[in-house]
Amino acid sequence: MTPAEQPTVPHRNVQPPTAQASFGAGVVVTDEAGRVLLGLHPSGTWELPGGKVDPGESIEEAAARELIEETTLVADPADVEVVALLLDSLTSAALTRMTAVTVVRTFTGTPSVAEPDKIERWEWTPLDRLPQPLFRPSAQALKAWNPELPLEDGPFHHYPFAARARPAGTGD
C-alpha cells in the first residue's frame, strides 16, 4: 500500500475539553452526640463544610483539606468515608454539579470560623432540630447520608455506595 492509499486518520483534538461538570466534596461532620456541624452563611442559609476537589487530589484528601480550611478541624483523609455521589444542575443548566458526600466522625480541634467572608459561625446541630433554610446542596448531602431526615432537597440523582456510614443511633 502506498502512502497515498493509506486511510487518513483524523487528528484528535488535543485541547482540554470544555468543562461540563464541577466536582466537590460535601462533608457531614458528626460529634459523639450524633449532631452535625453546620455553618451560617452571610446570606442566612446553613451549610455543611465542603468545596471543590483539586486536580490530583482524592475525594478524601479534598474533604479533609476543606474541613481544616473552613472549620479548623483536622481529620486524617483515612478517616473520611465517601458514602454517595450526587448529581444536580442547581447552579447552572449548562453545568452538572457532582458532589461526593463524605462523613467524618474522627477529628481533632474545635470548630472555628476560618473564612469569615463565607461563614459567620459553626454550630453543632441535633438532627431533629436542623436550622432553616438549609443550602440545598447541603440538604441533598444530609438526605443522602440519612434518608430518614425530613428535608426538602430538590431534584438530584443519588448514587449511594454499598458500604456507607450510618447516622448515629441507627444500629449496626
For each feature predicted by the language model, list its residue ranges.
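Conserved Nudix-box catalytic region and its N-terminal flanking loop in Nudix hydrolases
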Residues: 31-69, 74
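A short coil-to-beta-strand element that immediately follows conserved catalytic motifs
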Residues: 74-84
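Nudix hydrolase/Nudix homology domain
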Residues: 46, 117-172
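Acidic, metal-coordinating catalytic segment for phosphate/diphosphate chemistry
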Residues: 1-26, 32
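Structural detector for helix-capping/boundary residues
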Residues: 25, 51, 65, 78, ...
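Active-site-adjacent beta-strand/loop module that shapes the phosphate/pyrophosphate-binding cleft
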Residues: 23, 87-111, 123, 141-149
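Conserved hydrophobic "DFG−1" position in protein kinase catalytic cores
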Residues: 29-30, 38, 104, 124
